[in-house]
Amino acid sequence: MSSASVERIAIHGPVGTLDAHLAVPAQLPGNGRPGIVVAPGFPAAAGGGANSFRTFPGLVERLASDARLIALTVAFRGLSNSAGHFSLNGWRADLEAALDRIKEVPGFDGSLWLMGFGTGGAISVSLAGDRDDVTGVIAFAAPADFQDWASRPRELLSHARRCGAISDPNFPGDFSHWAKELQGISTVSSAAKMAEGDKKLMVLHGGNDDAVPALDARAIADAHGSAELRIIDGARHHLRHDPRAIATAIGFLDRRGRPVQVTEPR
């Protein structure tokens, strides 16, 4: 039996209602618990494929039950039943709305964490670099930047239509502006800004990731300087489904990003 309760909630986002799930530990201490917002990645196929948002309520339930965190996951615009259509800056704004929402949950103690997968991981690092209220980030399979998309914006637009992240044939109204947003987020630069603010960072990546090279993970970790980097042997891109990656992340959260204490042999 889970020691956490999960409820589906609506978040008032910048362009409409965002589908979200909130998980809270069964018993909260008087001084409260930290909060974590979980950001999904870009859909792999129609309905989400391996990145389907349908799997994320189970993840926040586990974070609330095992790590004793107040955990919230949000479907960005264009995903699940959320209003709107995909744009990179739009997803970033949606994540900001989720961060503001978790602060309203009774029992939140003020310590705010982010966990993101793929594009969601990159956006999480980007926000953490700019916001003073974020304690740390766990980024799974995050790209170092979006230059690959920026070099092929029409191909990305076609994929977004196929997978349902954009359902309006007239969107975007200004294609050049939509495409230019892809050049505006650098995970590497944001990781360096996180370090300046003394914010914790764990970077996890699959050793056999065929979507984002593991070199991107190393670049992000190097830019931060003291990030914990974990390359999961044999794992591919969708680390949401790799129990080793999730267990490693929960361990990091349990110690709140503090370095592992190694006892010297006597």
Identify the role of each PLM range.
Residues 1-30:
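N-terminal cap/lid segment of alpha/beta-hydrolase-fold proteins
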Residues 116-126:
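Glycine-rich nucleophile elbow surrounding the catalytic serine of serine-hydrolase chemistry
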Residues 85-106:
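Alpha/beta-hydrolase active-site loop
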Residues 27-66:
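Short, surface-exposed "cap/lid" segments of acyl-processing enzymes
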Residues 106-118:
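Alpha/beta-hydrolase fold nucleophile elbow
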Residues 126-136:
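Conserved hydrolase catalytic core segment
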Residues 18, 134-219, 223-231, 235-236, ...:
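The alpha/beta-hydrolase serine catalytic core
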Residues 58-81:
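Conserved alpha/beta-hydrolase
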